[in-house]
Amino acid sequence: MAKPPTIRDVARLSGVSTATVSRYFSGKADAVSPRKIESVQRAAKALGYTPSEIGRSLRLSQSRVVMMLVPDATNHFTADVAVSVESALKEIGLSMVLANTGEKAAQQDRLLSDAQGLRARAIILQGAIDTPRLREFVAQHRNLIFVNRMPASGMAAPYVGIDNFQAGFSVGKYFVERGYINPVAIHGPRHYSGSTARLDGFLGGLGEGARVRQFECAYTMQAGYDCAQSLLENEPAKYSIFCANDMIAYGVHRAAV
């Protein structure tokens, strides 16, 4: 198998120095004459040369890559957010690497180390899990952004997402205003800050003294289906069901029809 062309090959074919080729590909073309730029471009095209992003990141201690960690890449909401982020990054000349944590703390910690090894320009955490490693990372790096799940207490970092408590509160208040009976909350894991905030908001919106059946489950369609099956099979009645996210709601709807 032929070796990929190098910067030296481009310099040799174009008749310029390797320093000139390096300046051109590192975005410093203003220091290179138009004639030499044209020669470098022709040589690179003829050889099929592309600069090494790894080599560039080692030289600059930073890459053009932004790493996004997500809890479940199969979730429609997660996919929509990832596509939007990638589109925005492309507009400013950056690329994105998407990695799945599977809602596992150890996997998230390993991926944080991978991002550090890649010299990622920034890390976007959707559905972050509070771990000592994450806290260490937040303390050492400024380019971390939390999405959809707020950073835990003591971690100062930018957050993009909704007010989960207020969202739950609005639904609870709506239930009361509409006269819905037998409220049920099928919510996400309690150890996730967003899940807790949504549930607490919902209970607050219902008001003191409200009796609410609660089911804790994963943020998946199957989990929502299983909870609804258990509820409807054992006690057939009319329920007003609050679902913590759309995937749980899809599962509940499938069980109810």
Name each region found by the language model.
Residues 128-131, 196-257:
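Hydrophobic alpha-helical
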Residues 169-214:
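An alpha-beta-alpha
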Residues 158-185, 221-231, 249:
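Hydrophobic alpha-helical segments within soluble ligand-binding/sensing domains
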Residues 96-117, 168-169, 214-235:
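Structural motif
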Residues 34, 38, 47-114, 118-121:
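Amphipathic helical "hinge" segments at domain boundaries
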Residues 18-22, 58-73, 182-189:
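Short beta-strand segments enriched in small/hydrophobic residues
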Residues 1-61:
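N-terminal helix-turn-helix DNA-binding module of bacterial transcription factors
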Residues 103, 121, 125-170, 191, ...:
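Flexible loop/hinge segments that line or gate small-molecule binding clefts
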